[in-house]
Curated annotation (Swiss-Prot):
Described function: Part of the ABC transporter complex PstSACB involved in phosphate import. Responsible for energy coupling to the transport system.
Keywords for the protein's UniProt record, in alphabetical order: ATP-binding, Cell inner membrane, Cell membrane, Membrane, Nucleotide-binding, Phosphate transport, Translocase, Transport
Organism listed in the record: Trichodesmium erythraeum (strain IMS101)
Record field: transmembrane: none
ABC transporter domain sequence ranges: 17-259
Class of this enzyme: translocase
Name of the featured protein: Phosphate import ATP-binding protein PstB
UniProt key word Signal: no
PANTHER family (UniProt xref): ABC TRANSPORTER I FAMILY MEMBER 17
Length: 273
């Protein structure tokens, strides 16, 4: 089985994020092996692959959410602005200020719609006045294409919104603190088709200002929204455990129409497994 990776996408500009010879462990278990990739700025990059291949694990490494797991450790580097985000003197809270996350299930805070957006802005000291806070809240909700639906009920609970609206509220909350990168871990997995379309349209709008990395099991979704796609696979070892690795990373059209690797072709054509 293929264990090397094919990076046919080449970029000359400075990437938004890059992984260099990255391996991830939980205790003695190796979850990901030797990942190297450069994520371009202001593009949508999709991670696809079977369950258990490490897509979400890698995504969470990009803003150090895996630090919350005691047995997690990492070899290699993740570079943001040419600095390894895992250097000992780097504050993970500051990293998360610049690299935001939207999770699979909508998770609004138990607060009003207004305070869902304002919370991170307050914590980071990004608004100097009530007027400035109001502007940030409105701008963020407009960016999430939610303003017209909620502008007359900003004092209501975020839980009063529909599932699709809640997810757009979470996206608005993520962009309110003006991150460079927004990570999305299957953001449409729990949404109905109509809400999914709205979130995909939103992602297409947000790429103008943000770098977006999205994990998705929906390959049609990847073809609709992603500029680039990375295909990950998993290999079983003697213990029966499986480690993930990057098979191929290229422009989305190439991955789906002219992949270099047979494993990629088998997966995107439905012959996988």
């Amino acid at each position: 089985m293929l264990e090397h990776q094919t990076n046919t996408y080449q970029q000359n500009s400075t990437p938004a994020l890059s992984a260099e010879n990255l391996s991830i462990f939980y205790g003695d278990f190796k979850a990901l092996k030797d990942i190297s990739m450069r994520i371009p700025k202001n593009k949508v990059t999709a991670f696809i692959g079977p369950s258990g291949c490490g897509k979400s694990t890698l995504l969470r490494c990009f803003n150090r959410l895996n630090d919350l797991i005691d047995i997690f450790r990492l070899e290699g580097r993740i570079l943001y602005h040419n600095q390894n985000i895992y250097d000992p003197d780097i504050d993970p809270v500051e990293i998360r200020r610049h690299i935001g996350m939207v999770f699979q299930k909508p998770n609004p805070f138990p607060k009003s719609i207004y305070d869902n957006i304002a919370y991170g802005v307050r914590v980071n000291g990004l608004a100097k006045s009530k007027e400035e806070m109001d502007e940030i809240v409105e701008r963020s909700l407009r960016q999430a294409v939610l303003w017209d639906e909620v502008k007359d009920k900003l004092g209501q609970s975020g839980f009063a919104l529909s599932g699709g609206q809640q997810q757009r509220l979470c996206i608005a909350r993520a962009v309110a603190i003006s991150p460079d990168v927004v990570l999305m871990d299957e953001p449409c997995a729990s949404l109905d088709p109509i809400s999914t379309v709205k979130v995909e349209e939103l992602i297409n709008e947000l790429r103008q200002k943000y770098t977006i990395i999205i994990v998705t099991h929906n390959m049609q979704q990847a073809t609709r929204i992603a500029d680039l796609t990375a295909f990950f696979n998993a290999k079983a070892v003697e213990s029966g455990q499986r480690f993930g690795y990057l098979v191929e990373f290229d422009k989305t059209n190439n991955i789906f129409q002219n992949p270099r690797e047979k494993a990629t072709q088998d997966y995107v054509s439905g012959r996988f497994g």
